[in-house]
A protein has these predicted regions:
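An amphipathic, hydrophobic-aromatic interaction surface with interspersed Lys/Arg
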Residues: 1-272
């Protein structure tokens, strides 16, 4: 896009957003949720477009405000991938890939992109809290608990503190340290991870892996199955140790085991 005889790069997909771009979009969403600005899909896109341009040094020049507003409208029209409208007139901010753009927030460190550092117990509890929030979105403690579970203080090496079952109350209190827009950002990241595991292809050990079968029909992944039952079943088999040790096993390791078991079961069914 050309303006003032120079080109600027604007994002056309979530992967191209900068952390500041994502923060701006989250803040726009929160201001609308709080009733501080008019909440329409067109306004959401326009406000976000104006912030993206401002971050790249493009503001309304004196005497050329009409040209600037036309530019904002043009950029806003391209943001259908970030702000998505629904048939009922509602709209939502979309994170369609679990890249971690929030990073450190209020001194707390978030999970790695694509859940690479998540443990099974952390995932299990996050799915439970996520379900509670979606069933009762008016209760602010659900978002606080989710954010406080996923965003934790740094350890001595400066990395995110290891997961431990501190209890919902502790997670809620830690989540209070985050701003409401950051709490919703934790929710957006978690839902994008769940969708990614159910739909995308992962490369693990140089091989392509699809976890989709675990999230379909009578598979046992994500919200579709009982994660507590999976934990206890794995503990009984001692493949990862006790139930507590299962909770402290990397999420992707557990999902790979479940996928192998699922494929073996399918082979047995076909052989009969």
């Amino acid at each position: 896009m050309k303006t003032k005889k120079r080109y600027i790069e604007l994002p056309s997909a979530f992967e191209e957003l900068t952390p500041q771009d994502w923060k701006d979009a989250l803040v726009v969403r929160q201001r609308m949720a709080d009733g501080r600005v008019r909440a329409t899909l067109a306004d959401a896109r326009r406000l976000t477009a104006a912030r993206q341009l401002a971050r790249r040094g493009v503001t309304a020049p004196r005497g050329r405000r009409t040209d600037y507003l036309l530019l904002v409208a043009r950029v806003a029209d391209s943001l259908t991938w970030l702000w998505r409208g629904q048939d009922d007139g509602s709209f939502t901010l979309v994170q369609d890939t679990p890249l971690q753009l929030m990073g450190e927030a209020e001194g707390l460190h978030g999970p790695a992109s694509f859940g690479q550092d998540m443990l099974f117990g952390e995932w299990r509890l996050a799915c439970t809290i996520l379900t509670q929030y979606e069933q009762d979105p008016e209760n602010p403690n659900h978002l606080r608990a989710l954010a406080g579970l996923l965003w934790r203080p740094a350890d001595r090496q400066g990395r995110r503190q290891a997961y431990d079952a501190d209890g919902i109350t502790a997670y809620v209190e830690r989540g209070r340290r985050l701003q409401p827009w950051q709490q919703w950002g934790a929710y957006a990241w978690m839902t994008s991870l769940l969708a990614s595991l159910a739909e995308d292809t992962y490369t693990i050990g140089g091989e392509s892996v699809e976890f989709a079968p675990l999230f379909q029909g009578d598979g046992d992944g994500g919200k579709g199955g009982s994660l507590e039952r999976i934990r206890l079943t794995l503990a009984q088999s001692h493949v990862f140790g006790t139930a507590d040790e299962v909770d402290h096993t990397p999420l992707l390791t557990v999902l790979l085991k479940l996928l192998m078991d699922h494929e073996e079961l399918l082979k047995l069914k076909k052989s009969k």
